[in-house]
Design a protein with these regions (language model features):
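Small-residue-rich hydrophobic transmembrane alpha-helices
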Residues: 1-53, 84-103
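Residue-level recognition of transmembrane alpha-helices
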Residues: 38, 74-77, 81, 107-108, ...
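Membrane-interface helix-loop junctions in multi-pass transport and translocation proteins
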Residues: 53, 59, 67-68, 111-145, ...
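Hydrophobic alpha-helical segments of multi-pass membrane transport proteins
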Residues: 76-90, 140-155
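Alpha-helical transmembrane segments of multi-pass membrane proteins
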Residues: 4, 64-87, 109
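Cytoplasmic juxtamembrane regions at transmembrane-helix boundaries
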Residues: 100-112
Length: 163
């Protein structure tokens, strides 16, 4: 995730520079290249978390029950890592365009109004426990990404004029 955060900062700078130059094409290219790079940067973690979760868990724990639960959670986290990294970079790209308030609203909707209730329902009502919490968080991440990427595309499709 830290690589994706670094990529978000770099993407924000590149997008901001393109916006300042009134270059629509470079604004979009900078944002979408950042998304692709973030996805590729998170793939190694995803690979190990999905295919070797028990090995990773054994590095930190001895108790077999904790290892098994951690392995289950690592698979979910591994699958979410790509989307989480892409979400972070999309936020950076939007920051570079100067759009900060609407992404905040979108994040609030995705996590507080969608992700949290799903997490609660799965973890408490259906008794999925920590797995349900991660499914809820994952739904927030995924919904957020589905809201933010079209927002960036819409904003970056025309010159951005700041007063």
């Amino acid at each position: 995730y830290m690589l994706a955060i670094g990529m978000a900062g770099a993407t924000s700078i590149r997008v901001g520079k393109a916006v300042g130059m009134q270059n629509v094409k470079n604004t979009q290219v900078s944002g979408f290249v950042g998304l692709i790079v973030a996805a590729f940067l998170t793939l190694p973690f995803t690979f190990f978390a999905v295919f070797y979760p028990e090995t990773i868990a054994r590095i930190f724990f001895i108790d077999i029950e904790i290892i098994n639960l951690t392995a289950q959670v690592l698979i979910i986290i591994g699958c979410l890592a790509v989307f989480d990294g892409m979400m972070a970079v999309t936020l950076g790209a939007l920051r570079g365009t100067g759009d900060v308030w609407m992404p905040c609203v979108m994040q609030s909707i995705a996590f507080w109004l969608i992700g949290l209730p799903i997490a609660y329902y799965l973890s408490v009502n259906l008794e999925y426990g920590i797995i349900g919490l991660w499914y809820g968080l994952g739904s927030g991440i995924f919904i957020s990404l589905l809201l933010l990427v079209p927002r960036f595309y819409m904003i970056s499709s025309k010159p951005i004029v700041r007063l």
